[in-house]
Amino acid sequence: MTPEEQLRIIKEGTVEIIEEEELLKKLKEGRPLRVKAGFDPTAPDLHLGHVVLLQKLRQFQQLGHEVFFIIGDFTAMIGDPTGRSQTRPPLSREQVLENAKTYEHQVFKVLIPEKTTVVFNSTWLEELGTKGLIELCAKYTVARMLEREDFSKRFKEGIPIYIHEFIYPLLQAYDSVAIKADVEIGGTDQKFNLLIGRDIQREYGQEPQVCITLPLLVGTDGVRKMSKSYGNYVGITEDPKTMFAKIMSIPDEIMWDWFLLLTDYNKEEIEKMRREMHPMEAKKLLAFTIVKRFHSEEEARKAKEWWEKTFSQREFPEDAPLVKLNEKKLRAVDFLVKIGAVKSKNEARRVIQGGGLKINGEKVTDPNTEIEINGELKVKVGKKKFYRVVSG
């Protein structure tokens, strides 16, 4: 494959390449490029938002390049200030290492193991020492840091910015120096940090990395970026049925971006699907493709059949969990908490008043309705939760 053909493939799904000419020049050198992406293990599981970056890394691997998956065990203890209106609480070493264990296992659901080098940035950052850290800090200015939108906003509003928050992007940049990165990939929110990497590499006498930014995946709500804190995520270790149902719940308008960012279908194939397929069938294909990647073709087939029976044909799932209650009668608001469908009475009220509770096919809209537990009740909560409830 020619360098120009590689560049065309790499550009698909990207927002910006800085600089494109530099990337083409590196590709023309005919050697495997050293491609880097860093992930701070601030939470124990990866979700599809992370997969956008992993998918692009895999693409580089398929083109013959070497991927460095950097687990930011050192930087996670500082906390990335990107997009923050206030200081991020630090994590303990124990929390970070526990989260990192799952990252090591989960990344190979996307990346090719033999073409991936997994490294912890504590390997070189702990060895940097006080002298090395001061030398690193001396290579950048506070004025340049304050050009960043989130820092600038906090500074103008009198919200404290702590010194360690300025140091974070410098340490991320030093990761690029440590592994001699040719390319770094990140979300659009990471652009400032990626560009600092170019500057710091120059300061250490290296050729600057090419920065590739990718879109932030919109979550299942169709509004905000995918995040566990927003509850709009699809975890890559979730069971096949949950994963399939969550994907089927996304708005049609974001489905095509998901195809582009999360699957191996190219733009031409996606455009053809958009013209020729019914949106429902296309979304089933998307859900099937993603579940297959993280589980198996057989599990994806079963999840699809289950979804069609349960949601499309409105059948109650036979394998819904059985919940036994001691009470014979409960108010609806207490009933939802007791069966474990919600965590609080306030949440139960919102679900009920929003029309999200059905018992034996009948909608319950008054939180104070008395529910008699006589025989087996078939309970549906929201779009995806099902329970069989009995007394005794």
UniProtKB/Swiss-Prot annotation:
It comes from the Bacteria. InterPro entries: aa-tRNA-synth_I_CS, aa-tRNA-synth_Ic, Rossmann-like_a/b/a_fold, S4_RNA-bd, S4_RNA-bd_sf, SYY-like_C, Tyr-tRNA-ligase, Tyr-tRNA-ligase_bac-type. It is found in: Cytoplasm. A motif ('KMSKS' region) lies at residues 225-229. Gene3D superfamilies: HUPs (3.40.50.620), RNA-binding S4 domain (3.10.290.10), Tyrosyl-Transfer RNA Synthetase (1.10.240.10). Residues 330-390 form the S4 RNA-binding domain. It catalyses: tRNA(Tyr) + L-tyrosine + ATP = L-tyrosyl-tRNA(Tyr) + AMP + diphosphate + H(+). GO terms for biological process: tRNA aminoacylation; tyrosyl-tRNA aminoacylation. PROSITE patterns: AA_TRNA_LIGASE_I, S4. A motif ('HIGH' region) lies at residues 41-50. GO terms for cellular component: cytosol. It is an enzyme of class 6 (ligase). Its EC number is 6.1.1.1. It holds the Pfam family tRNA-synt_1b. ATP binds at K228. Signal peptide: none annotated. One of its GO terms (molecular function) is ATP binding. PANTHER family: TYROSINE--TRNA LIGASE, TYROSYL-TRNA SYNTHETASE. NCBIfam families: tyrS. Catalyzes the attachment of tyrosine to tRNA(Tyr) in a two-step reaction: tyrosine is first activated by ATP to form Tyr-AMP and then transferred to the acceptor end of tRNA(Tyr). Homodimer. Belongs to the class-I aminoacyl-tRNA synthetase family. TyrS type 2 subfamily. This is Tyrosine--tRNA ligase. It comes from Aquifex aeolicus (strain VF5). The gene is tyrS.
